[in-house]
Amino acid sequence: MTLRLRFWGTRGSVPAPGPRTVRYGGNTPCLEVRTDTGALVILDAGTGIRELGRSLVADGDGISAEIFLTHAHWDHIQGIPFFAPIFRPGNRFTIWGSKALETSIDRVIRDQMAPVVFPVGFDELQARVEFREIAVEERTGDGYVVSSFAVQHPGGALGYRFTDASQPKRSFVYISDNELGASEGYGSGAGWREALVAFVRGASLLVHDATYTTDEYAQHRGWGHSTFEDAVMLALDAGVQRLVLYHHKPERSDDDIDACVAACRALVARRGETLEVTAAAEGMTLEV
């Protein structure tokens, strides 16, 4: 069995359209996952989910999907009111959010569609939408097993590991927002990084926050994001096969991202390792 991935949004914090971002994309986070059984999983609902929705509607009705949100910051939920399938009867969606959030994910999504900020209320949606809370636990889906891990990000966030139900050695980890460079203020505990490495260990693919350069991080410590060098070191420590840099800084141009990828590959080479490194781009497809 194969898990098939497609990136619909790769940018962090705020959409960044324009001529400098056409290759890697300007939409905020959204990743589509398909299993051989036909199940649809959506990771995060940034502005990238709008184009995913248009694609799904073009394929017909009767759409069913599980949407796993890493957390409730704007760039990970702002596409939901523009997700066309959610307005159509006969479609069904389960939206999963962290149990550790200060406010339920149900309340957060409803509030972003309140009349003062959006013209169509949540209760006017015609699809069936169910909200569920996920703790740090493992559960089985249609053709996959998903587990979660509490990462370091203001307000709380989760990373997810998806494993092929029929082939446990095939798995990928999705960690969109995570600060690897500091632990103070998060209450993670002394063994947090070791536990994170164990969570990621042996994955076929790691999609990880790579928002900052080392120089940029010095000015943004505590903001909840990692450098691309830190992402490489996590991937190496965990023995993953492939690293995909994600959550690109809005100001980062396509050429800048190319330079980050080149620097990561040089770092891997200096350490004598074979980790494959690339950067997430809208429209990019991968198989696990």
Please report, for each region that a protein language model flagged, where it lies by residue.
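Binuclear metal-dependent hydrolase catalytic cores
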Residues: 1-173, 181-186, 197, 257-288
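Conserved beta-strand-loop-short alpha-helix elements that form
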Residues: 176
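Cap/insert and terminal regions of metallo-dependent hydrolase folds
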Residues: 179-275
